[in-house]
């Protein structure tokens, strides 16, 4: 309820007593609204009195009688306000609409949809949709009934319902509404369809995007430049760059001129695939069409070239056409330098960014912190964190996760758990990544019991573990030979519909080989194949290493041959494992032969390789001396 001052109360009374359409009942109601006690008896509330109160902005009266309003009275009042939807919206704001029945709520939404601004009705729709009390189909059907009561031809209400679902990232519900509109003969606007296509693209539901786009075409809903831009982006995501560029010709056929966004989308698509020359050709074409490249054009190219260590080429090109790096450019440069281990240059770009008047973002700091941890510069990372805190910047979930993971990777469980407690205190909820890092550090310290307890706690809170978390915990148990628990986790994964991958099976195979159960490990590879999971070079190296440690070089070489037949190239680990097996069996000549093969394949032997060969030869010499 709003509070009113004495002058405000007087104004309300005067406006009713002196205004047009004076009603004694309304005047008495206004007086009672200001002076009533729990025992006061209100006069009957009629539609006439309620409408007078609304039209004269006597909202204190509306608020006073709100809990006495029946759905029927509210509906009648709303229908009387169809031509003044702004008053209908104010009326709804002064009563508890959600105390009323679903039918009345939908009627209110339908009336308010006649406002020129879509924001009020969109907000109401979001509240109804997120309440989850009714299905989208029920909501749609009730809105159709409300729409029919208003006797209006406009179908904007249903377009807004679709857009509302898209804003809530409820893409399946948005698509359902689209087809319900089709059933009713309501044709969605192109902009509404673009909302669905955009969301499908963002969610990487590429196949669904093409099906929906085809249905748009069949329904003769015209595409505009935004539609084409979205579909060009979809093609770029698929890696179909030639087809994406071909859409420029299709746009011309439909008389739609590309915009700078069209060209920038293509440049980004080519750049993400490392097709820099193709991206440059598109830039040349856009220039010929009168478009000047901007930072959105060059930043994707800069990003790829940064990874290649060729950022200076792009910066020089940008400078030549008068483009100045923006905050996105600097963050790209900082990330590139950090990933390449050049932290000095990364911080130099940060300083240059500040000199140019740009404020470093969370992304900037998170990139630098991650880079410092990757280079084992823990103290420098802690200094940077203090700097961030001194600036009054509150750490976000990404920063906490980077820090926790950094400490976990370096085995500092104490600091990692302290940060976990701190983020909880700050009201930031830990994620799957947070708990995976903590489980990792516990397993690394052979504290698998504590890791299991943390895992059970996480699951108990309702968080569904992901594949990485399961693999991390499983690897911890495999490392200490606790294979019963490891296989029980595999069963839990099946129960939770978490599909294992090659990493899962490699962990189990490594654990079995560590226990000397080589045949079981081999059988596990068979199971892996039956489940449609392709073994990788790690799978084969694990078996080769296991057999070699046992001295079973026959089976080790058989696995190596199978590995070669499937197109996997032996690695340094493969050869070193085989050399250890030959050394164990005192097969010096074969070891020398394998060393020569290794060199011919372009694999440089390391100390371990030479030690195994020397040991094998020494054993062979000793064997010859004994004979």
UniProtKB/Swiss-Prot annotation:
A GO cellular component entry from the record: mitochondrion
PROSITE patterns according to UniProt: PPR
UniProt protein name: Pentatricopeptide repeat-containing protein At2g15630, mitochondrial
SUPFAM superfamilies in the cross-refs: HCP-like
Origin: domain of life: Eukaryota
Targeting presequence: 1-29
UniProt organism field: Arabidopsis thaliana
PPR repeats: 154-188, 189-223, 224-258, 259-293, 294-324, 326-360, 361-395, 396-430, 431-465, 466-500, 501-535, 536-570, 571-605
InterPro entries for this protein: Pentatricopeptide_rpt, PPR-containing_protein, TPR-like_helical_dom_sf
Gene3D superfamilies (UniProt xref): Tetratricopeptide repeat domain
Cysteines engaged in disulfide bonds, as pairs: none
Pfam family for this entry, one: PPR
Record-stated family: Belongs to the PPR family. P subfamily.
Subcellular location: Mitochondrion
Keywords annotated in UniProt: Mitochondrion, Repeat, Transit peptide
């Amino acid at each position: 309820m709003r509070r009113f001052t004495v002058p405000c109360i007087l104004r309300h009374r005067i406006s009713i007593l002196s205004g047009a359409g004076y009603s004694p009942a309304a005047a008495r109601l206004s007086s009672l609204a200001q002076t009533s006690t729990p025992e006061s008896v209100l006069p009957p509330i009629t539609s006439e009195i309620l409408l007078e109160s609304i039209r004269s902005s006597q909202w204190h009266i509306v608020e006073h009688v709100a809990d006495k309003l029946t759905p029927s009275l509210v509906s009648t009042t709303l229908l009387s306000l169809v031509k003044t939807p702004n008053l209908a919206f104010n009326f709804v704001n002064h009563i508890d609409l959600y105390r009323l029945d679903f039918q009345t709520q939908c009627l209110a939404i339908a009336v308010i949809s006649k406002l020129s601004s879509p924001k009020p009705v969109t907000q109401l729709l979001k509240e109804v949709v997120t309440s989850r009390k009714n299905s989208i189909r029920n909501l749609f059907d009730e809105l159709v009934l409300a729409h029919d009561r208003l006797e209006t031809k406009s179908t904007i209400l249903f377009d807004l319902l679709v857009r509302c679902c898209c804003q809530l990232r409820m893409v399946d519900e948005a698509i359902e509404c689209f087809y319900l509109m089709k059933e009713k003969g309501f044709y969605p606007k192109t902009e509404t369809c673009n909302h669905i296509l955009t969301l499908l693209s963002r969610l990487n539901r590429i196949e669904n995007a093409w099906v929906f786009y085809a249905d748009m075409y069949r329904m003769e809903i015209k595409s505009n430049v935004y539609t084409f831009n979205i579909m060009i982006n979809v093609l770029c995501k698929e890696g179909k760059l030639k087809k994406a560029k071909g859409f420029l010709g299709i746009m011309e056929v439909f008389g739609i001129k590309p915009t700078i966004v069209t060209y920038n989308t293509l440049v980004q698509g080519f750049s993400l695939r490392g097709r820099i020359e193709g991206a440059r050709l598109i830039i040349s074409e856009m220039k010929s069409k009168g478009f000047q490249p901007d930072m959105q054009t060059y930043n994707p190219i800069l990003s790829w070239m940064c990874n290649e260590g060729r950022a200076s080429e792009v910066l020089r090109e940008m400078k030549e056409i008068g483009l100045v790096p923006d905050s996105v450019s600097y963050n790209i440069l900082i990330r590139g330098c950090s990933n390449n281990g050049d932290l000095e240059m990364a911080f130099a770009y940060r300083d240059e960014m500040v000199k140019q008047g740009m404020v470093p973002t969370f992304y900037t700091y998170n990139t630098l912190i991650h880079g410092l941890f990757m280079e084992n510069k823990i103290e420098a990372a802690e200094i940077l964190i203090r700097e961030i805190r001194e600036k009054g910047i509150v750490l976000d979930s990404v920063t906490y996760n980077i820090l926790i993971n950094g400490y976990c990777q370096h085995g500092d469980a104490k600091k990692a758990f302290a940060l976990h407690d701190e983020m909880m205190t700050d009201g930031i909820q830990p994620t799957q990544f947070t708990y995976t890092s903590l489980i990792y550090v516990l397993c690394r310290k052979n504290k698998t019991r504590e890791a299991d307890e943390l895992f059970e706690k996480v699951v108990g809170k309702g968080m569904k573990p992901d594949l990485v978390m399961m693999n991390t915990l499983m690897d911890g148990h495999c490392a200490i030979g606790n294979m019963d628990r490891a296989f029980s986790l595999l069963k839990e994964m099946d129960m939770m519909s978490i599909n294992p991958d090659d990493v899962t099976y490699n962990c189990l195979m490594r654990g079995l080989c560590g226990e000397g159960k080589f045949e079981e490990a081999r059988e596990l590879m068979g199971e892996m194949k039956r489940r449609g999971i392709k073994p990788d070079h790690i799978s084969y190296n694990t078996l080769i290493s296991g057999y070699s440690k046992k001295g079973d070089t026959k089976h080790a070489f058989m696995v190596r041959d199978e590995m070669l037949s499937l197109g996997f190239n032996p690695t340094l680990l493969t050869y070193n494992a085989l050399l250890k097996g030959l050394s164990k069996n005192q097969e010096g000549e074969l070891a020398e032969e394998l060393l020569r093969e290794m060199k011919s394949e372009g694999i440089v032997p390391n100390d371990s390789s030479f030690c195994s060969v020397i040991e094998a030869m020494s054993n062979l010499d000793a064997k010859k001396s004994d004979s």
